[in-house]
Amino acid sequence: MFRQWSVQSGPAPRRPESQAASEELWEQEVERLCASRTPVRMLPYAMADKRFIRELREPEGVKTTFWQRWHRPRRVARQHLREAEQRLARGFGLWEGALYEIGGLFGTGIQSYFTFLRFLLLLNLLTMLLTACFVLLPLVWLRPPELGPALKLRLQCSSSPLPQSDIPRFHNPLWNILTGRAFNNTYLFYGAYRAGPESSSEYSIRLAYLLSPMVCLLLCFCGILQRMAEGLPQQTLLGQRYRTPLSAKVFSSWDFCIRVWEAATIKKHEISNELKMELEEGRRVELAQQQTRAQKACRLLTYLRTNILIVLLVVGAISAIFWATKYSQDNKEESLFLVLQYLPPGVISLVNFLGPQLFTVLIQLENYPPGTEVNLTLIWCVVLKLASLGMFSFSLGQTVLCIGRNKTSCESYGYNACDYQCWENSVGEELYKLIIFNFLLTVAFAFLVSLPRRLLVERFSGWFWTWLDREEFLVPKNVLDIVAAQTVTWMGLFYCPLLPLLNSVFLFLTFYIKKYTLLRNSRASPRRFRASSSTFFFHLVLLLGLLLAAVPLAYVISSTHSSWDCGLFTNYSAPWQVVPELVALQLPLPSQRALRYLSSHAFSFPLLILLSIVLTVCISQSRANARAIQGLRKQLVWQVQEKWHLVDDLSRLLPELSPEPGSPHSRASRPRSFCPGFPCPGSPGPRTPRLAPSNRLSSSSLGAPSASVPASRFHFPSRTEL
């Protein structure tokens, strides 16, 4: 390894065998550095050592080839250009500075919520871009025919319910905007899309409208899986019992490039949060190991009691949503119409507001670690939210599509044509009201609850106001809100193609509202958790919401009769029927035969066998990789033990090789570091070997400390130093 030799006095006497062993180690290290293709700038050495390594790789007097001289400046230019692109991308990244500030002040756990919100915004923008490119722009370019008169259907309906056209309308513009009736004849809803008959030469708007939601859901599915897979390799390699040493955090956490006081303050908070999380995790592990059998039995009973109570709360909430939706759709009297319009969204929002609060209190009784507590709260909140949305969809299906009910209008037209002549618009309006109501609640709680609470706590003093304090920023509740809004957006892709645009605007505003609430109106949670322990669950919850949205959409596209009065699929028994028609019109006969074969049982059975084989191979490879990872862990432990043995041998060897106390090579003049060639904490830097007279570097250029100068210690820079 690199050794520092004095150029002012000769070396101390050494034993021949030890000198030969050290020279052999030195020659091996030099050969390794010369043969390595690692760039010099990436090596963990001081600048003087890097210059020496460059001289070893490119000695003077040796001529390089023309290709090397031509390729080197271009390689350096490409590297500089790549770094400039990365800096530019970080500079123009969405909310990079805000995310850095939030992560430093409140920890990576709360920062993960805002990062997740940004990911949802990008998903919505991608969905909107695909819809605009494949549906809206071709529709405007092709100029579909004008809307003709509505079909006059003679419906056999009872006299009690009012048809949709006779439902009282309120001409207040604000109310029409909130309910979505102001946009019934716009491209926001399904009913405004029209197209002529299909032909073999024109672009099919119907096929694009049908496939764009499916493609968007598929792309969102791939993006969520990619984000979920990013954290898996680290968890697999490190394992669940891995803990970063506190010494590594203490000596390597500070960024010495910081020259601004605000950035230094944020960095101090970030390091403090990391150390607090490490100490709290260690304390919880010690307490869990010291529990007796009686304490474990009491804890198990607490788990059972809490989970039974949570299940009862979920069942009651689902029942309330079902009956609220059913009552709202079955009663459309003029006196109650204004209230019943927002009865289902109101009940769902009330459940989603009270549910996380109760779940947080109940799960805290179980005394879980902060990361596990957040994940369990999130799981129960998601079960509540997805079950609520599922029950809401089922109730709408019962009312609109007569699922599980027998009605005369449903037998004739496939849906409840008496009450809903354009049922796609009605479903779209319900989903639109859910999105609007969710955002209005976010604004109301931020400025009508959190802000007055903070002002009252700061204005008055007393035990009550001390107990009340500022609002705690609950990550599970906030994640639940944006996941619910995103699930509703995915459910409405077929009924409201422009709903992702509306949700993108709401997510953009939600980021700044939540940031203001966090920085001004909220207090930091005393139970800190890591982002890596919850980010995976955030995306898992989002994936469950995607599956919940995909199941009703697949049923509607494949098996539900379209409205006779509006939309693109008025003449089709189901929207999917346009696909066989276009296949027969636009594809040649061999392609049609190939598609028939791909959709037949003769192809499905071999495909199933092939997928089974591939799945078996993947599982076998995964198990082999797990065994290899275990072997690498053991090998790493063995290497660490071997290093410690070498350190012990070196500590026994140093007294034998130490010169006289007055010599400049005495042990007192050297720093006590067992990291030769590597920048250890507290050491002045790597040590460089003695060079030939032509390539010799002075000891002053290596930055070798004198005996009177103590080794530098780690400290935070003061404000005057910055």
Swiss-Prot record:
One of its GO terms (cellular component) is endoplasmic reticulum membrane. The keyword Membrane applies. Residues 678-687 have a biased composition (Pro residues). It comes from the Eukaryota. Glycans are attached at residues 184, 375, 571. Belongs to the TMC family. Residues 1-21, 658-722 are annotated as: Disordered. The modification Phosphoserine is found at residues 6, 18, 658, 663, 673, 698. Residues 140-204, 329-375, 452-492, 558-598 are lumenal. Disruption phenotype: Knockout mice breed and grow normally. No major defect in T cell subset numbers or function. Decrease in CIB1 protein level in thymocytes and lymph node cells. The TMC domain mediates the interaction with SLC30A1/ZNT1. Residues 1-118, 226-307, 397-430, 514-536, 620-722 are cytoplasmic. Residues 689-712 have a biased composition (Low complexity). The lineage of its organism: Eukaryota, Metazoa, Chordata, Craniata, Vertebrata. Keywords: Endoplasmic reticulum, Glycoprotein, Golgi apparatus, Membrane, Nucleus, Phosphoprotein, Transmembrane, Transmembrane helix. It is found in: Endoplasmic reticulum membrane; Golgi apparatus membrane; Nucleus membrane. Expressed in thymus, lung, prostate, placenta, testis and spleen. Expressed in lymphocytes and peripheral lymphocytes. GO terms for biological process: intracellular zinc ion homeostasis; negative regulation of canonical NF-kappaB signal transduction; negative regulation of protein-containing complex assembly; positive regulation of apoptotic process; protein stabilization; regulation of extrinsic apoptotic signaling pathway via death domain receptors; regulation of tumor necrosis factor-mediated signaling pathway. It holds the Pfam family TMC. Interacts with TMC6. Interacts and forms a complex with TMC6 and CIB1; the interaction stabilizes each component of the complex. Interacts and forms a complex with TMC6 and SLC30A1/ZNT1; the interaction regulates zinc transport into the ER. Interacts with TRADD; the interaction competes with TRADD/RIPK1/TRAF2/cIAPs complex I formation and facilites complex II formation. The keyword Nucleotide-binding does not apply. GO terms for molecular function: protein sequestering activity; tumor necrosis factor binding. Residues 366-534 are annotated as: TMC domain. Its main location: endoplasmic reticulum. The gene is Tmc8. This is Transmembrane channel-like protein 8.
